[in-house]
Amino acid sequence: MTLDFPRSFRTLFLIGLAALLAACQSVPPTTGFTAAQIAALQSQGFVENGSGWMLNMPERLLFPSNESDVSPDQQQRISDIAAKLVSVGIVTARVEGHTDSTGTSAYNLALSQARAQAVAGPMQAGGMRFTADQIVGRGETVPLSSNATAEGRQDNRRVVVIVTPQ
């Protein structure tokens, strides 16, 4: 016994089968980075967030109150990270300095800019390039934690490095 399906059912079946097979294809990532660049970012401690890849060092880039100096060990680590990124074609980033709410807004803005510069320097030594608008002080405007506690203020005294596709 042979079933005779009308031509429209066969056509519909073939279209459905083609759509099902197309859905099984692997789609390359649309992040704007190559697989080698993503591997380098991950190996250096970057994590993907909504605005790019953010450096997430275990000791983080935290600062004592009213300080903008980076220790020699951190300078070397930052320079090494930059050199690794440059080796896979990532040659720039955004460096954002932040403060707690202690002090005036003007003082905190200047301090956060100095912190961003202190991190950008070793990155430049590692081969990265920056324009003036990529090294930014945010002052106290983007806190991670409440400034009501000493721990919260410590969390907010930081520098964030963000890498996005060129």
Which residues are covered by each model-predicted region?
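Bacterial N-terminal signal peptides that target proteins for export
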Residues: T2-F13
